[in-house]
A protein has these predicted regions:
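A short N-terminal beta->alpha junction/helix N-cap motif
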Residues: 1, 20-21, 30, 34, ...
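Condensing-enzyme catalytic core of the thiolase-fold
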Residues: 96-426
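Phosphopantetheine-dependent thiolation modules in NRPS/PKS and related acyl-activating systems
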Residues: 2-93
């Protein structure tokens, strides 16, 4: 089948599925309202039409009829050219490992069913499941709203919840009870976790006062700000800073007199990882000598969970089954964590206990994919290649990968395909 013939077939298929009379082959398929399930059906019908095995995410790899028709009819030489271009990105860097490599010298966190990192490790070893129903009293501020009360009963609200998001020793951090009451729980918890992480690293916070310590926090969404906004009559002016995501890291820098970069990172699901990436770069560039990097997520109001559930993103069974035929969606969760980072040379010189080493990192954007929230397979391949190149590591030597693992019909195949393209190239 020629590229022209396949393009016509695709136009007719999209028209039949969507009811649109005029189909523009250069327009993203997502613009016609095709769902992720439609994309999977399309890949199956293309397999039958062309007699070849196709990835179910093919319509996300090539998001327009024009691109899809060209890719499926491209010559072998064209495909080899693409592989050659990708291989060119895999050139590794050469520099002093002691200066480029970053040591993890401390860690602390709070997790569903685990009050610290050691308890989390025990849960992982046991294969324990710590997700469950919405805790009693959570989101009670909305119980008087008939619509929300009904939605909270109808939609899936099972998740991973921390046992206690309210307790806080305000005097320890020099805060008045009034200011503490008007602070996002994420600010309160991360203050405590920062202190605990430095304790774990055997670095007294007082010893770092006035020095270039960086604080990088991944935090997506502002549940507490929405909660405050829903009843402004009950809010105090302290809520201006108390509900600001930017203040989560800056509260720590202020409390401990840290003078390095202090920033909140919001890149949705990847926020914590990207905060670590920025910390690595800041240490390499000499912007700080010690860095706290991590993330926090507290589900302080129901809106995002209810909307995700209504969209069909959240697992109706409350199960986490990434990369499984039974996968039926994500499960939202709370957590907070920090790692303490130093350049390897500094950690060795100080005789710190090195828990692990970060050899490289990379970040990018999907660009214009098949929908604002849709993953881009080629961009995932690119960021993996850049990360391994930055680390100076041959992907063929990698034995273990920690995956995103959305547990969704398209997210899992796209991630698996990208990992296979980079790690399984040979």
């Amino acid at each position: 089948m020629t590229e022209h013939d396949l393009s016509l077939w695709l136009e007719q298929w999209v028209s039949a599925v969507t009811g649109e009379a005029e189909i523009d082959p250069s327009k993203p398929l997502e613009a016609y309202g095709l769902s992720s399930r439609d994309a999977v059906i399309l890949s199956g019908e293309l397999e039958n039409l062309l007699g070849v095995k196709l990835d179910p995410t093919i319509a996300y790899q090539y998001p327009t009829i024009e691109a899809l028709a060209h890719a499926l009819t491209a010559s072998q030489e064209d495909k080899q050219g693409v592989r050659g271009a990708r291989a060119g990105r895999m050139q590794t860097v050469s520099a002093s490992p002691a200066q480029r490599d970053i040591a993890i010298v401390g860690r602390a966190g709070r997790f569903p069913g685990a009050a610290n990192a050691d308890e989390l490790w025990a849960l992982l070893l046991d294969g324990a499941v710590t997700t469950g129903p919405l805790p009693a009293g959570r989101w009670s501020e909305y119980a008087g709203d008939p619509y929300l009360r009904t939605k909270m009963k109808e939609e899936a609200t099972d998740g991973g919840y921390l046992d206690d998001i309210a307790s806080f020793d305000n005097e320890f951090f020099g805060l008045s009870p009034l200011e503490a009451q008007n602070m996002d729980p994420q600010q309160r918890i991360m203050l405590e976790v920062a202190w605990e992480a430095l304790e774990d690293a055997h670095i007294p916070a007082d010893r770092l006062r006035g020095t270039p310590v960086g604080v990088f926090v991944g935090s997506s969404g502002n549940d507490y700000g929405m909660l405050i906004g829903a009843d402004p009559a009950q809010a105090h002016p302290y809520a201006l800073t108390g509900a600001s995501s930017a203040i989560i890291p800056n509260r720590i820098s202020y409390a401990f007199d840290f003078r390095g970069p202090s920033m909140n990172v919001d890149t949705a699901c990847s926020s914590s990882l990207v905060s670590v990436h920025h910390a690595v770069r800041a240490l390499r560039d000499g912007e700080c000598d010690v860095a706290l990097a991590g993330g926090v997520n507290i589900l302080a109001n129901p809106f995002a969970s209810l909307m995700f559930s209504e969209l069909g993103v959240i697992s109706p069974t409350g199960g986490i089954r990434a990369f499984s035929d039974d996968a039926d969606g994500i499960v939202r969760s709370e957590a907070a964590g920090f790692i303490v980072l130093k350049r390897v040379a500094d950690a060795v010189a100080n005789e710190d206990e090195i828990l692990a080493v970060i050899k490289g990192s990379a970040t990018n954007s999907d660009g214009h994919s098949n929908g604002l929230t849709a993953p881009n397979p080629d961009a995932q391949v690119d960021v993996l290649e850049r990360a391994y190149a930055d680390a100076g590591i041959d992907p063929a030597t990698v034995d273990l990968v920690e995956a995103h693992g959305t547990g969704t019909i398209l997210g899992d195949p796209i991630e698996a395909t990208a990992l296979g393209a980079v790690l399984g190239r040979d």
